[in-house]
Amino acid sequence: MKTTLVVVVLACIVALTSALEADLLSHESCRYISSNRYCGHDYMDKLCNTTCNCKDVLSEFSCGVLKKDGQCNKADIQAKCKLTCDKC
């Protein structure tokens, strides 16, 4: 009985932690917020935690070219262009 209770409590903690790390607004809304540089505001970071903390290592131009060329399916490109390739 105690083991079951512990497992249920741990499952709830994991679920709550995952929910706090995810975007609370829609993907489109968070992309708009990010592209218009509203992520610096504390309340926006909380509403769009995943998107606001997702960055491209390469320039926006370079990642855009790579995405147009269909390179987003490659692991190294996904790591360098997380935001552009929707891999956050």
UniProtKB/Swiss-Prot annotation:
Keywords, alphabetical: Disulfide bond, Ion channel impairing toxin, Nematocyst, Potassium channel impairing toxin, Secreted, Signal, Toxin, Voltage-gated potassium channel impairing toxin
Signal peptide start and end residues: 1-19
Entries under PROSITE patterns matching the protein: SHKT
Disulphide bridges, residue numbers: 54-88, 63-81, 72-85
Main location: secreted
Cell compartment(s), UniProt: Secreted; Nematocyst
Record-linked InterPro entries: ShKT_dom
Tissue: Expressed both outside and in acontia, a specialised envenomation structure laden with batteries of venom-containing nematocysts found only in the superfamily Metridioidea.
Ranges for domain ShKT: 54-88
Family under the similarity heading: Belongs to the sea anemone type 1 potassium channel toxin family.
General function of this protein: Inhibits voltage-gated potassium channels (Kv1/KCNA).
Protein's name in the database: KTx type I
